[in-house]
Regions:
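Acidic donor-binding/catalytic loop of UDP-sugar-dependent glycosyltransferases
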Residues: 48, 93-106
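A conserved acidic beta->alpha catalytic loop
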Residues: 23, 42-51, 67, 90
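Short, well-formed alpha-helical segments that are part of the catalytic scaffolds
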Residues: 13-28
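Catalytic core of nucleotide-sugar-dependent glycosyltransferases
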Residues: 205, 209-212, 218-244, 262-276
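Glycine-rich, basic loop-to-helix element that forms the pyrophosphate-binding segment
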Residues: 64-81
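Short aromatic/hydrophobic "clamp" motif used to bind/position activated sugar donors
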Residues: 86
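Conserved donor NDP-sugar-binding/catalytic core segment of glycosyltransferases
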Residues: 100-133
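Conserved nucleotide-sugar donor-binding catalytic segment
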Residues: 139-222
Length: 304
């Protein structure tokens, strides 16, 4: 019987933690198709998170001090886990009952398997299903070696769904660790994971990802850290994939420019947009940094 290690990091997670844990522990096929190992690492929560873990009889580790993000806890758990396959869960991800079973069903095809998901905005009550379509009735897509790596490297909006909560990967890749300088960025980890690897995507939504209006991606400090660390992450591949890295640089700058456009800092928006790919869309953004931005923000999606 295969063993699945599930890594869950927590910090002040009391609102949804019981539902998250139950969704993991109540997976179809548990004890029949696979054995489940749940590893929880808490980052010095100050709410009732630890009490909930104790009441649910969940063994957990905890960091000596708050590290400012989930990555240190993920690395601790990666070093402790003993499963043949590994999943990483966020404390606001609710797994559907068939998640592991469906991922395992195609795990013989590649060492990395992902799926689609449902994005639920708690503040607006809107839900968006993010699932790739299969051209046939197999219900999954196969990606050649480096196909997904290159789409992630170039910041392409098309290709395999690789949000962290969707990934099942073989334990032979557990040596790939997360950055701990900022403690919350996973772009470089995804690049390292998919480098020189084939992968498979199950064309179904297998979990619910809950977010709210105060999305971390809109925090300026997070954006600045993500910007510089993303540039550092892609530079590793410059000798091997120079044109793709240049494309990535342009898109990273474009994203930063649109972020500042969205929050109304037009001077910085122009600075980064001028470093991006100069195309009609970019020119229109640049022009409307002087006049017309309110109309653009009202009727068009700018960022995220």
């Amino acid at each position: 019987m295969k063993k699945i290690s599930v890594i869950l990091t927590t910090y002040n997670s009391e609102n949804q933690l019981e539902e998250v844990i139950d969704s993991i522990n109540n997976q179809e096929g548990k004890g029949e198709l696979f054995e489940l190992e749940l590893l929880v690492v808490d980052d010095c929560s100050t709410d009732n998170t630890k009490s909930i873990l104790l009441n649910k009889r969940v063994d957990f580790q905890f960091t000596r001090e708050n590290t400012g993000g989930p990555n240190h806890g993920r690395n601790l758990a990666l070093k402790l886990c003993t499963g043949e396959y590994i999943c990483i869960a966020d404390h606001d991800d609710i797994w559907f009952p068939n998640k592991i079973k469906k991922l395992l069903a195609v795990s013989h095809l590649a060492q990395i398997v992902t799926s689609g998901y449902v994005l639920s905005d708690i503040s607006s009550l809107n839900e968006v299903v993010r699932v790739s379509k299969s051209a046939d009735k197999k219900g999954y897509l196969e990606y050649e070696s480096n196909e997904t790596f290159l789409s992630k490297l170039t910041k392409s909006k098309v290709g395999q769904q690789t949000y962290l909560g969707s990934i099942l990967f073989h334990s032979s890749l557990k040596h790939i660790l997360f950055e701990e300088k900022y403690g919350m960025i996973d772009f470089d980890w995804v690049l390292k994971l998919f480098y020189n690897q084939k992968s498979v995507e199950v064309c179904s939504a297998l979990y619910l990802r809950k977010v709210d209006g105060s999305n971390l991606s809109l925090d300026e400090n997070y954006r600045i850290n993500d910007y510089y660390y993303s540039l550092k992450a892609i530079s590793v591949y410059e000798n091997e994939y120079s044109s793709q890295v240049k494309c990535a640089e342009n898109r990273i700058n474009g994203s930063m420019g649109r972020y500042y456009y969205l929050i109304g800092n037009m001077k910085l928006a122009r600075k980064y947009l001028l470093k991006s790919t100069i195309e009609i869309k970019t020119i229109l953004y640049l022009i409307t940094t002087f006049v017309g931005s309110k109309f653009v923000k009202k009727y068009f999606k700018i960022f995220g």
